[in-house]
């Protein structure tokens, strides 16, 4: 009993460390380059492609799609961006957020101490505010891998538990269970990056038969649920914002919901395509990269489909969130 409690505390402690690292990384990068990135977003004109590229670039740098989405909602409420300009930026945010999963797939837990030390030395060595902010960002990046290592240590014994293994076998057999699990985790933690990191770590653990606990086919529905759950931040942030800001949040939700529905319906093809685009090797060695690639594939394909349909998306969300009737 005492050992189980220790493992639970270690798991949630690792998750807390990861979430703190994500928040510190985002804030440090905002300090280092935030004003320029805001100017980049505000300068987006009528070109949807430029909007996608700007959204992807800013999110990749800030490492927080939620922060960029809230920023876009603020610009729309202030009249700096129109609804039609903002929607492609949101599409780009979804692509930019996949950079986190790609970085975490490198499995740098073994050198996390070196990353932490490098960040600390940069903080002390740099005199300027931006230099220290970069040092704090590097240190926060090391905290991400420290949190992942702690979560992995806690999850190792779970992989051998018969009850847990039975539940995971049901997730593999029924994709909707994985979808709900991913949705529930992201709604609870309020960070799709954290839940995807947890998924990558978990899938890389061996089960009783030596293969992945989830396997790629079991992990992808959870990933799709994560993508649905991440839309709640924008929805909550838009509640007190302008009508067009609410429509931007609705567009974000429609983008992820429709994509998740289509990809879940075509799950076997999704699995095969992800495997074909990923490195070959032992399952446990490559599955974290496969999940990262699946995340990127989902968001890139959805953007390529929705980008030419931006006017349709705008009309749809305008009907979904209509103007108030004039009395």
Residue ranges and their predicted role:
Residues 1-9, 102-111, 165-170, 217-220, ...:
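Interfacial loop-to-helix junctions that mark the boundaries of transmembrane helices
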Residues 2-48, 138-184, 202, 211:
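Helix-loop-helix hairpins and the membrane-proximal interhelical loops
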Residues 11-23, 55-59, 117-126, 140-150, ...:
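Hydrophobic core segments of alpha-helical transmembrane domains in multi-pass membrane transport
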Residues 15, 35, 39, 43, ...:
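Alpha-helical transmembrane segments of multi-pass membrane proteins, especially transporters
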Residues 17, 27-30, 66-70, 97-105, ...:
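Alpha-helical transmembrane segments and their lipid-water interface positions
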Residues 20, 24-32, 36, 40, ...:
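Membrane-spanning helices that line or support transport/gating and their immediate boundary helices
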Residues 59-62, 70-94, 103-111, 119-124, ...:
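Membrane-interfacial helix-loop connectors
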Residues 148, 155-171, 237-327:
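Transmembrane alpha-helical segments and their short flanking loops
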């Amino acid at each position: 009993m005492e050992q189980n409690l220790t493992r639970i505390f270690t798991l949630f402690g690792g998750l807390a460390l990861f979430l703190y690292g994500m928040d510190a990384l985002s804030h440090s990068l905002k300090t280092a380059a935030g004003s320029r990135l805001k100017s980049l977003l505000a300068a987006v004109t009528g070109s949807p492609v430029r909007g996608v590229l700007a959204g992807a670039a800013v999110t990749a740098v800030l490492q927080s799609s939620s922060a960029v989405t809230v920023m876009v909602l603020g610009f729309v409420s202030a009249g700096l961006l129109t609804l039609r300009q903002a929607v492609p930026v949101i599409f780009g945010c979804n692509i930019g957020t996949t950079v986190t999963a790609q970085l975490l797939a490198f499995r740098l837990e073994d050198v996390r101490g070196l990353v932490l030390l490098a960040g600390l030395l940069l903080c002390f060595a740099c005199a300027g505010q931006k230099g220290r902010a970069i040092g704090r960002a590097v240190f926060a990046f090391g905290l991400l891998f420290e949190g992942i290592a702690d979560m992995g240590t806690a999850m190792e014994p779970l992989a051998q538990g018969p009850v847990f293994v039975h539940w995971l076998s049901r997730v593999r057999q029924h994709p909707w269970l994985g979808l709900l699990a991913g949705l529930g985790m992201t709604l609870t933690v309020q960070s799709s990056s954290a839940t995807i990191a947890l998924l990558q770590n978990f899938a890389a653990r061996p089960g009783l038969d030596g293969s992945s606990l989830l396997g790629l086919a079991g992990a992808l529905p959870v990933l799709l649920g994560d993508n649905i759950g991440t839309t709640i931040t924008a929805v909550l942030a838009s509640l007190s914002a302008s009508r067009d800001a609410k429509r931007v949040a609705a567009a974000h939700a429609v983008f992820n919901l429709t994509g998740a529905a289509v990809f879940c319906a075509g799950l076997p093809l999704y699995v095969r395509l992800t495997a074909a685009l990923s490195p070959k090797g032992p399952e446990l060695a490559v599955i974290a990269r496969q999940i990262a690639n699946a995340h990127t594939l989902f968001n890139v394909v959805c953007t390529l489909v929705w980008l030419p349909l931006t006017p349709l998306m705008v009309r749809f969300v305008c009907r979904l969130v209509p103007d108030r009737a004039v009395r």
